[in-house]
Swiss-Prot record:
Nitrite binds at H65. Keywords: Cytoplasm, Heme, Iron, Metal-binding, Muscle protein, Oxidoreductase, Oxygen transport, Phosphoprotein, Transport. GO terms for cellular component: cytosol; mitochondrion; sarcoplasm. It comes from Rattus norvegicus. The gene is Mb. Pfam families: Globin. GO terms for molecular function: heme binding; metal ion binding; nitrite reductase activity; oxygen binding; oxygen carrier activity; peroxidase activity. SUPFAM superfamilies: Globin-like. This is Myoglobin. InterPro entries: Globin (IPR000971), Globin-like_sf (IPR009050), Myoglobin (IPR002335). It catalyses: Fe(III)-heme b-[protein] + nitric oxide + H2O = Fe(II)-heme b-[protein] + nitrite + 2 H(+); H2O2 + AH2 = A + 2 H2O. Belongs to the globin family. The modification Phosphoserine is found at S4, S32, S121, S133.
Length: 154
């Protein structure tokens, strides 16, 4: 299920645009995630009290966490599938400390694609969307495999 060199190039090209505003993109991704899947908000003690989109938009903590999420994801994407060293601590913390189910990683992957589609419609066509989808699936599958090793049934 690996990606071709051309597919990785499409992923990294669009990710270059994301890196121009990691905090803004991250904030939009998290807000979109919480709106589409409100149950995911319960996993974030820091944000559970944010009930409205306006409260979410004005939360510096949410913006900061969005930046952290997309920074970590960018580091993983740049490894072009050779990301075992980066996946291990992420899987460890998400399985044992945060207890984030793989399903929630699917949700955020879908949201990332939707946000990129909305922001970069001209540069994020069907081929680029397909490549990003494959890259995010590879990431999720590798996280899920680590979860299994750790005995987490998420």
């Amino acid at each position: 299920m690996g990606l071709s060199d051309g597919e990785w190039q499409m992923v990294l090209n669009i990710w270059g645009k994301v890196e121009g505003d990691l905090a803004g993109h991250g904030q939009e991704v998290l807000i979109s995630l919480f709106k589409a899947h409100p149950e995911t908000l319960e996993k974030f003690d820091k944000f559970k009290n944010l009930k409205s989109e306006e409260e979410m938009k004005s939360s510096e903590d949410l913006k900061k966490h969005g930046c952290t999420v997309l920074t970590a994801l960018g580091t993983i994407l740049k490894k072009k599938g050779q990301h075992a060293a980066e996946i291990q601590p992420l899987a460890q913390s998400h399985a044992t400390k945060h207890k984030i189910p793989v399903k929630y990683l699917e949700f955020i992957s879908e949201v990332i694609i939707q946000v990129l589609k909305k922001r970069y419609s001209g540069d994020f066509g069907a081929d680029a969307q397909g490549a990003m989808s494959k890259a995010l699936e590879l990431f999720r599958n590798d996280i899920a495999a680590k979860y299994k090793e750790l005995g987490f049934q998420g």
